[in-house]
């Protein structure tokens, strides 16, 4: 199970194909784990991987000769255990948003001591990984009819892993029904290898064919079908079985590591037309290159179950299990019997049943062997399929953790497939034949995994892996169930009620629809509130899960948007269906505060969680006017299940309300906010602040707290009262000045020069504060405790702390909830309702006044610019800014010319979201028989101005059914899915129709482009308080530069539409752009929680800190270990694994190993394509990194192809006007220049220069580099005059920014001298020709030396932010000691404050809720350090 096995030594160790195991058979075996006994539960829940980090990966201590390659150095070894282990489908991806919760949780644990186990592992130096790494054993495996096979396994693996391995190897993949025997004793599938006494290195395990049962025969047939369609991308396009697409192999035409270096003169470097600068609307077809040839050879025409099934009684007694029907490529038809000994041809025909064996009879234990025997075409095709399958990269064959859906798909041939048909029946749950006891008790599984022990690292890995697997299965089942509910395949538990009020149970999961049932949300916004409540509830579940308090349980929760409906799927609390909710709830309120209950155990558990989540315990009056203490919002309900567990649910108000979007009598907002248009009355009253905002707000207050404490500490230690007074006079203005400086720094209109000027002032202020505290610290221990307490008290009062003598910032989530009567405490204390309200107001003001300007300022440097709406949303969320502030963000961006691209992305995101609100209403009132016509009509109205002619089929079926065709088109809602108040028809100039369903079912035909854009405009004003000022797609294009193809992509991904892969003519004047055949599918948009891998995260962040200090090798080792742990928890395929791979590739490159970098980055690209999507922004960035490493390895042509792909995807996503396009164009230009394609090179660099001037200004370093590249290219073309002008620009920028003596300025001056020389020479020759009058004679050749590949690579590194610089050992020691000094000073600040507060609070027993201070800024300056004298710096 070698995760960190050196690829050079792994020939015998790594066993072949690395079990991709994407078959349901293997899923079945995994699921069996869950059915095991309690005794083996911890082992069984974690499929196949026993406890931990697989293989002889490196130890943290005592291993000096660690491999430099990352934990995964061969494709086969890469996949978790040295053999790929199947990853089950797990939900979709708010992964980044969820990661924020994880980060915050970890930070909180650090700040507050955590809960023991989690705090302990933060110091990676203290973790001994010996427990996870074992030497492994070599085992021989003997298969019937095959050579002896030798594999290396970890002693911690389960026997089942060997099953997985054999089922994926080419020679044994067709075997499913076998046992493994050692010395004639059958091994238990769920036994760890180390528990088998007779097993030792060199032992031979024998594969023994077992008799089939009905279940095993079905599994075998399914496995054969999966092998035959292994290359078929249909499942990936249809979004099933956790398959997804990757096109890296298609673009590189094979493994990059197998390529030979290319000579520059042999490279075909002409870019496709759609990649050259100036293309406005990129084509759609190149998104899926070569999809026509992806399917592979056909082995059989038909393989299906026979209509003669099941075997009659007499044949059952002869051992018949089932009958199959096959048509071979030779057009021969066979009826096949499956019996306990294998498969044989029988004598049945389509009309006659004759189950006796055919003559001559041939019995085979494997169906593949039998089919190969009767059909030569099958034998050839199967071999070809197997060969192509084994040539694919291992990462292409593993199932992804979450289903990735494609927004564009080609026309797929629909083939006969009995197994697919069988899976589609609603009675099927997907795993009946695999699990004892049939349906799974999801709640029990989810809670049991959380109860697993977590004290040691192996235990935590086991627990997190179990949580991840069960959660993934639950998300898949919930998604499938939600689709079945909306499609009308599930019977409601209350079928007699109105369809909007119906609830469903399927597969032990409870489903409810996003409508206001029984006026529950009437006071809060009705259907609008009911629609957003599940999303807020999911946020609550996420943060409570991240805090992970032992004994406190949340429900498994998934929110699915499908066909215009929002469905919430939840696991079921044991016993809750047996009694009324009123009887179940022991904590909280079921009627928004009218009746309130409390419970001591819940108070204890929620108080623990509240420390991390900054929730203030508070008291409210119940219906009997008795005070009741709560440690959560009133809506949070506590129910003790029949299993004795304490569950909390309805966590939609976990965080305090956002008063900027509530019109409240008692709230007076600041003048600044009122001028900006606040408060805005939102359409529901559930608006909450984000956890990230509260963290930032508390951190901001903590910085002020330290500042003020520093001043008072200095005063406290002054020797004379007079000195104290004078110091106060000096210091307080200094503090005010510092605060003023901070405010100025957040001014978004500052120029870069102003920003640079401000920085030294900040530094001086910080240094002054550090010195003050260090001086005070020397005496603080002997200070009078009363005086110390006074210092703390003053600092607390100044920053508005909830407690008088402690830094304590916690929020009351109920403080503005209507109908709740609070118990008011003394004024100025934490119990004071006025003080609680003020704090929530301050946090909301902080969002607008500080966080939005900070967000804009952060993106002014364009260091990691958002590429699409999803990127933008993630960035907003990381700053704690809710998307409802998007209108305000757009206004801020609109004042910044250099933020044009982000302004456009934000406007497009707003249009997409507004359109989504309208679309959901539109879909709910559409007859299922008209869905494709209705969707295509909607897209025509949104994206085109051509003829709109919705054609409704008038066949008899439609007439008979009227408009009430589907189960859920009856869910008529006036809410517009959180969109419009009126049905679409009322806003199209038509009259209001009757409310009959038949009339409503045709509302969609009345929508026109004009009416739709009017609705979008109205929605943008109502929801975001921003006037779109567009009445058509054309006006949006001309005003904002939005491309229709970008808008189509964004909208399809947002609402779950799959369109046909073809070129769309948006300007067609004769027929609509979209027809009903262009809508291929609709898919669910799934929101869920991503479980975390806490230890891996801690290794990763520690590794990053080491890298920032310049300790690349140490950082590399830590991040390698993080990847090791991630492989254990998540398996081979996961977004976080991809982040680790990208970092390891970059580190390998910086450490000088370009080949290693290429191997790792190739895996990172494939992983990103598969888990994020083929056109995801992350994938685009991975492609650009891979192109650099390809060039460094001599694959010049391949590097260009990768850049062309990246550029195409980037333009398809956000258009050409983007800083990232400038970077890619600079790279392309430089490589084309190296290949002598000067004219092409010039086109790309001119475009890059134009963008760099626009976004960085005419004095930026990016612009200087672009001018220099242009000069190089023009000089090679002989245009010395232009080259000279451009190099002069470069020189002037370097001179003004870096000074005359800087190396770059001197290089540019030298370049100018050479260009001037060349220009003079050329002019002389021209003059000679003219003076001689020989105009007809040929010009003498100009000697131009093309650049060397080394100089091109150096320039590529510069463009991509990588510098290699020479530093002497003395310099390294000097800089490092300076950094250590700074870090110590920073630590001293913390120590001073802690000791001061401890003194003030009785021997340090108080809880100081302070955010974690970090040394990132100090560490960043250490980036140039390393252990050698040549160093790489990555910026």
UniProtKB/Swiss-Prot annotation:
One of its GO terms (cellular component) is cytoplasm. Disulfide bonds: none annotated. SUPFAM superfamilies: Hypothetical protein c14orf129, hspc210, TPR-like. One of its GO terms (biological process) is intracellular distribution of mitochondria. TPR repeats lie at residues 1096-1129, 1222-1255, 1257-1290. Pfam families: CLU, CLU_N, eIF3_p135, GSKIP_dom, TPR_10, TPR_12. Keywords: Cytoplasm, Phosphoprotein, Repeat, TPR repeat. One of its GO terms (molecular function) is mRNA binding. Residues 58-67, 959-975 have a biased composition (Basic residues). mRNA-binding protein involved in proper cytoplasmic distribution of mitochondria. Belongs to the CLU family. This is Protein clueless. It comes from Drosophila pseudoobscura pseudoobscura (Fruit fly).
């Amino acid at each position: 199970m070698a995760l960190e096995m050196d690829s050079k030594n792994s020939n015998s160790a790594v066993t072949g194909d690395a079990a991709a195991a994407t078959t349901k058979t293997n899923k079945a075996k995994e699921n069996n784990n869950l059915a095991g006994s309690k005794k083996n539960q911890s082992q069984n829940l974690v499929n196949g991987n026993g406890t931990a980090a697989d293989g002889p990966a490196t130890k943290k201590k005592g291993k000096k000769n660690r491999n430099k390659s990352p934990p995964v150095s061969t494709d086969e070894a890469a996949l978790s255990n040295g053999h790929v282990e199947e990853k089950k489908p797990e939900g979709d991806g708010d992964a980044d948003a969820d990661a924020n919760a994880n980060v915050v949780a970890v930070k909180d644990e650090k700040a507050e001591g955590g809960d023991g186990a989690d705090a302990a592992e933060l110091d990676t130096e203290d973790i001994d990984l010996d427990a996870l790494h074992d030497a492994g054993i070599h085992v021989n495996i003997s298969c019937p009819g095959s050579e002896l096979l030798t594999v290396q396994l970890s002693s911690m693996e389960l026997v089942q892993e060997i099953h997985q391995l054999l089922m994926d190897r080419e020679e044994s993949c067709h075997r499913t029904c076998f046992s493994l025997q050692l010395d004639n004793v059958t091994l238990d599938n769920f036994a760890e290898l180390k528990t088998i006494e007779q097993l030792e290195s060199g032992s031979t395990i024998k594969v023994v064919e077992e008799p089939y049962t009905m279940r095993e025969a079905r599994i075998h047939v399914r496995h054969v079908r999966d092998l035959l369609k292994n290359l078929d991308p249909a499942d990936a396009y249809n979004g099933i079985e956790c398959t997804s697409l990757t096109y890296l192999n298609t673009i590189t035409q094979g493994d990059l590591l197998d390529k030979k270096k290319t000579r520059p003169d042999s490279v075909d470097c002409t870019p496709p037309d759609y990649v050259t600068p100036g293309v406005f609307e990129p084509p759609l077809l190149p998104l899926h290159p070569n999809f026509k040839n992806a399917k592979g050879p056909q082995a059989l025409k038909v393989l299906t179950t026979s209509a003669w099934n099941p075997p009659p009684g007499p044949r059952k007694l002869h051992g018949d299990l089932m009958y199959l029907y096959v048509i071979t490529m030779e057009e021969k038809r066979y009826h096949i019997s499956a019996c306990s000994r294998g498969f044989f041809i029988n004598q049945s025909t389509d009309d006659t049943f004759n189950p006796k064996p055919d003559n001559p009879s041939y019995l085979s234990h494997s169906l593949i062997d039998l089919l190969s025997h009767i059909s030569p075409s099958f034998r050839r095709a199967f071999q070809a399929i197997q060969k192509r399958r084994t040539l694919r990269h291992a990462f292409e064959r593993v199932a992804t953790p979450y289903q990735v859906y494609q927004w564009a798909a080609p026309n797929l041939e629909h083939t006969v497939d009995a197994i697919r048909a069988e899976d589609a029946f609603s009675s099927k749950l997907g795993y009946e034949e695999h699990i004892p006891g049939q349906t799974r008790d999801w709640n029990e599984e989810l809670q049991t995994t959380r109860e697993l022990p977590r004290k040691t690292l192996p235990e935590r890995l086991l627990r997190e892996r179990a949580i991840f697997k069960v959660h993934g299965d639950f998300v898949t089942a919930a998604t499938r169930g939600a689709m079945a509910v909306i499609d009308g395949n599930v019977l409601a538990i209350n079928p007699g009620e109105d369809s909007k009020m119906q609830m469903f149970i399927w597969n032990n999961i409870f489903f409810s629809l996003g409508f206001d049932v029984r006026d529950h949300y009437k006071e809060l916004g009705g259907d609008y509130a009911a629609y957003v409540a599940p999303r807020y509830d999911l946020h609550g579940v996420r943060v409570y899960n991240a805090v992970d308090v032992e004994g406190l349980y949340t429900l498994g929760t998934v929110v699915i948007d499908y066909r215009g409906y929002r469905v919430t799927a939840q696991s079921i609390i044991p016993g809750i269906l047996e009694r009324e909710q009123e009887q179940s709830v022991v904590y909280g309120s079921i009627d928004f505060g009218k009746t309130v209950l409390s419970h001591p155990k819940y108070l204890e558990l929620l108080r623990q969680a509240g420390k991390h989540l900054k929730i203030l315990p508070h008291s409210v009056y119940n219906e009997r006017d008795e005070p009741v203490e709560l440690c959560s919002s009133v809506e949070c309900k506590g129910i003790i299940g029949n299993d004795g567990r304490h569950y909390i649910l309805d966590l939609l108000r976990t965080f305090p309300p956002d008063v900027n979007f509530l019109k409240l009598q008692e709230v007076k907002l600041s003048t600044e906010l009122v001028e900006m248009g606040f408060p805005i009355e939102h359409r529901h009253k559930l608006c909450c602040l984000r956890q990230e905002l509260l963290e930032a707000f508390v951190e901001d207050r903590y910085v002020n707290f330290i500042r003020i404490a520093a001043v008072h500490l200095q005063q406290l230690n002054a020797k004379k009262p007079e000195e104290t007074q004078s110091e106060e006079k000096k210091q307080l203005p200094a503090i005010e000045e510092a605060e003023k400086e901070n405010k100025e720094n957040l001014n978004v209109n500052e120029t870069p020069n102003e920003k640079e000027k401000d920085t030294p002032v900040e530094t001086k202020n910080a240094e002054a504060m550090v010195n003050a505290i260090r001086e005070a610290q020397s005496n603080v221990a002997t200070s009078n405790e009363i005086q110390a307490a006074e210092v703390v008290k003053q600092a607390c009062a100044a920053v508005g702390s909830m407690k008088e003598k402690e830094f304590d910032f916690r929020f009351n989530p109920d403080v503005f909830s209507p109908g709740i009567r609070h118990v008011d405490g003394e004024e100025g204390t934490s119990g004071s309702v006025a003080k609680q309200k003020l704090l929530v107001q301050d946090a909301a003001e902080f969002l607008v006044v500080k966080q939005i300007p900070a967000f804009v300022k952060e993106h002014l440097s364009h260091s990691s610019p958002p590429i699409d709406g999803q990127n933008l949303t993630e960035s907003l969320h990381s700053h704690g800014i809710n998307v409802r502030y998007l209108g305000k963000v757009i206004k801020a961006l609109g004042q910044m010319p250099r933020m044009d691209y982000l302004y456009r992305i934000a406007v497009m995101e707003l249009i997409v979201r507004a359109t989504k609100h309208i679309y959901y209403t539109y879909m709910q009132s559409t007859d299922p028989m008209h869905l494709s016509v209705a969707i295509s009509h909607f897209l025509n109205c949104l994206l085109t101005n051509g003829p709109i002619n919705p054609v409704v089929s008038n066949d008899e079926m439609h007439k008979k059914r009227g408009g009430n065709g589907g189960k859920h088109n009856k869910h008529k809602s006036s809410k517009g899915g959180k969109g419009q108040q009126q049905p679409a028809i009322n806003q199209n100039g038509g009259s209001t129709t009757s409310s009959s369903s038949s009339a409503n079912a045709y509302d969609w035909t009345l929508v026109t482009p004009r009416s739709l854009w009017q609705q979008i405009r109205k929605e943008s004003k109502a929801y975001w308080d921003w006037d779109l000022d567009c009445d058509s797609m054309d006006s949006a294009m001309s005003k904002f530069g939005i491309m229709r193809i970008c808008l189509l992509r964004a909208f399809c991904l947002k609402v779950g539409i799959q369109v046909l892969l073809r070129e769309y003519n948006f300007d067609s004047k004769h027929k609509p752009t979209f027809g009903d055949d262009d809508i291929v599918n609709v898919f669910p948009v799934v929101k869920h929680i991503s479980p975390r891998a806490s230890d891996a995260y801690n290794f990763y962040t520690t590794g990053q800190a080491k890298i920032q200090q310049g300790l690349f090798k140490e950082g590399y080792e830590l991040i390698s270990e993080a990847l090791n742990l991630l492989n254990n928890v998540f398996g081979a395929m996961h977004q976080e694994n991809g982040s680790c791979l990208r970092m390891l590739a970059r580190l390998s490159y910086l450490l000088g190993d370009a080949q290693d970098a290429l191997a790792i980055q190739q895996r990172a690209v494939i992983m990103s394509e598969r888990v994020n999507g083929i056109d995801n922004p992350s994938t685009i960035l991975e492609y650009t990194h891979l192109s650099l490493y390809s060039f460094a390895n001599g694959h010049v042509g391949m590097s260009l192809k990768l850049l062309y792909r990246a550029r195409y995807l980037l333009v398809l996503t956000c258009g050409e006007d983007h800083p990232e396009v400038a970077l890619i164009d600079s790279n392309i230009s430089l490589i084309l220049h190296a290949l002598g394609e000067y004219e092409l090179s010039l086109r790309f660099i001119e475009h890059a220069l134009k963008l760099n001037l626009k976004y960085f200004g005419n004095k930026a370093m990016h612009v200087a580099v672009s001018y220099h590249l242009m000069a190089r290219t023009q000089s090679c073309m002989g245009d010395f005059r232009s080259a000279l002008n451009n190099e002069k620009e470069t020189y002037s920028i370097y001179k003004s920014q870096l000074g005359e003596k800087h190396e770059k300025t001197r290089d540019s001056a030298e370049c100018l001298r050479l260009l001037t020389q060349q220009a003079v020479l050329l002019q002389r020759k021209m003059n000679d020709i003219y003076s001689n009058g020989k105009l007809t004679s040929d010009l003498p050749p100009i000697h131009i030396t093309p650049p060397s590949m080394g100089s091109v690579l150096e320039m590529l590194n510069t463009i991509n932010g990588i510098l290699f610089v020479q530093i002497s050992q003395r310099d390294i020691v000097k800089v490092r000691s300076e950094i250590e000094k700074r870090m110590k000073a920073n630590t001293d600040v913390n120590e001073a404050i802690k000791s001061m507060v401890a003194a003030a609070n009785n021997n340090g027993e108080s809880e100081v809720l302070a955010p974690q201070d970090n040394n990132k800024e100090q560490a960043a300056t250490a980036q140039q350090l390393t252990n050698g004298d040549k160093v790489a710096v990555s910026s």
